[in-house]
Amino acid sequence: MSGPLQYKWFFESTTPVEGHMHAIARTISTLQTKFQFMEIFETHSYGKVLVLDGRIQSSQHDEFIYHEILVQPGLLAHPKPVRAMVIGGGEGATVREILRHPSITDCLMVDIDGEVVEECKKHLPEMHQGVFDDKRTRVLHEDARAYLRRPRSASTSSWSTCPSRSKRARPACSSPRSSTR
């Protein structure tokens, strides 16, 4: 008989007084980068999971829900999208959704953490489905704020996967001050 003590568990708090537990089938990769602590493991219920600084970013069996909704409404509303930019998105699933549109000729992903992107390329092919090898994909490993301050074409659609606030790295999409509106 299987029981909870036979598994290694991952616990993620969802509120100060509540959380969710996942039984881990196997650990695939753990890595402390300059910017964050990354884990990739496989769970019994959700398949492979990408975790950054203790927060789940994507899980194999349900990531399509988030990534399709993030990308498809904007691209479907556009008459002919040609270029796109993704801020963050290390596992490649946002780029995957963008490249479903044949009119896209160039998709730039700006993700500060190249080590995480490389681990995702290696261990999460179910999520990125080979987009890193697509000639339309370009990847830059730099601070998105610095990149966005440089002049660029105004005709590029952009998406931010906006990671949770980290003590080590502030997301490029966060505001330096809270809005009171």
PLM region descriptions:
Residues 2-10, 33, 58-181:
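The AdoMet/dcAdoMet-binding core of the Class I SAM-like
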Residues 1-49:
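N-terminal auxiliary segments of SAM/dcSAM-dependent transferases
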